[in-house]
């Protein structure tokens, strides 16, 4: 590769952004996430040829939350023809908060994209129709992608989310009223919350997502994860819709396809080169990791990387 990387570079980047800790806010609308220590900070890289770099709390597991929406879309792509998926969910950025009901009502129950809550719930509804055990299947996929056999769900987080699920339930029932939700709402919500409650580290996330940097192929697996076209499509969706309503700001500052979660994680893709995962639990007003975005900005400037 035409760039030099070592752990010391990542350590330097973390030191530069560490002063931001204390300026964001840990997600508190999910009680099980509110207790996470806000000072955590980690970063990891996995290259398409299997090299690994890390710094900070890169090996500590956390709740990946909405990062899982990429994985559920990947599973759906492996079980449904393309036209069936995109009849039920769009490909456009929302520009609204990730749990908005207003836009969904105006657009007759068709979510703008699979990375807002409504879109991810439709994808989970589709998986319920094709998989006998959707939660177990997700674990199998993630463990294979990551090469780690003990990745599991945080039952406390999943239960906490289900106990505070009124808004997501409203989203699901609204889509059901428009005929775009076919299965039992509580069952699908449980699957959705378990996906969000996957516990993974930065290093595990970088390794899991490196297939998106390598035209759908993971260096340690014999079979492609998705086709090259599907990998490009997923990266495009991440670029336009992966950072909630701040996708444009993120494109301006960082310039990579990425997906964030309110657990403080972000996964970013440098096509043909690497997957990057960062974690810092304190969030900005849009629900993205404050120090995590700054770390990615520093890294892309250091490496001279952008898809634009």
Swiss-Prot record:
Keyword vocabulary terms for this entry: Hydrolase
Pfam families membership: Glutaminase
InterPro entries: Beta-lactam/transpept-like, Glutaminase
Reaction catalysed by this enzyme: L-glutamine + H2O = L-glutamate + NH4(+)
GO molecular function, a single term: glutaminase activity
SUPFAM superfamilies: beta-lactamase/transpeptidase-like
E.C. numbers: 3.5.1.2
Binding site for substrate: 66, 117, 161, 168, 192, 244, 262
Regions annotated as coiled coil: none
Any single biological process term in GO: glutamine catabolic process
Similarity comment: Belongs to the glutaminase family.
Complex and partners: Homotetramer.
Protein name per the record: Glutaminase
Organism, scientific name: Salmonella enteritidis PT4 (strain P125109)
Gene (UniProt): glsA
């Amino acid at each position: 590769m035409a760039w030099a990387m070592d752990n010391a570079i990542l350590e330097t980047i973390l030191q530069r952004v560490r002063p931001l800790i204390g300026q964001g806010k840990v997600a508190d609308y999910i009680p099980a996430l509110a207790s996470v220590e806000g000072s955590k900070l980690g970063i990891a890289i996995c290259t398409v040829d299997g090299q690994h770099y890390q710094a900070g709390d890169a090996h500590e597991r956390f709740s990946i939350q909405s990062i899982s929406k990429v994985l559920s879309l990947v599973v759906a792509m492996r079980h449904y023809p393309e036209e069936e998926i995109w009849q039920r969910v769009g490909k456009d950025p929302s520009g609204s908060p990730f749990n908005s009901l207003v836009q969904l009502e105006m657009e007759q129950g068709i979510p703008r994209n699979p990375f807002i809550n409504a879109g991810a719930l439709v994808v989970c509804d589709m998986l319920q129709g094709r998989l006998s055990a959707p939660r177990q299947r997700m674990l199998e996929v993630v463990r294979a992608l990551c090469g780690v056999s003990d990745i599991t769900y945080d039952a406390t987080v999943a239960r906490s989310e289900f106990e505070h699920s009124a808004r997501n339930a409203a989203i699901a029932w609204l889509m059901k009223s428009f005929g775009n939700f076919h299965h039992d709402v509580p069952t699908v919500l449980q699957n959705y919350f378990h996906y969000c409650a996957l516990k993974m580290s930065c290093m595990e996330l970088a390794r899991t997502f490196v297939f998106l940097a390598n035209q759908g192929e993971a260096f340690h697996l014999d079979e492609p994860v998705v086709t090259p076209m599907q990998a490009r499509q997923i990266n495009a969706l991440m670029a336009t819709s992966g950072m909630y309503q701040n996708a444009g700001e993120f494109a301006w500052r960082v310039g990579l396809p990425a997906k964030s979660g309110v657990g403080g994680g972000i996964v970013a893709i440098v096509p043909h080169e690497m997957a990057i995962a960062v974690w810092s639990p304190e969030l900005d007003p849009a629900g993205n990791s404050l120090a995590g975005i700054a770390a990615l900005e520093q890294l892309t400037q250091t490496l001279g990387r952008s898809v634009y």
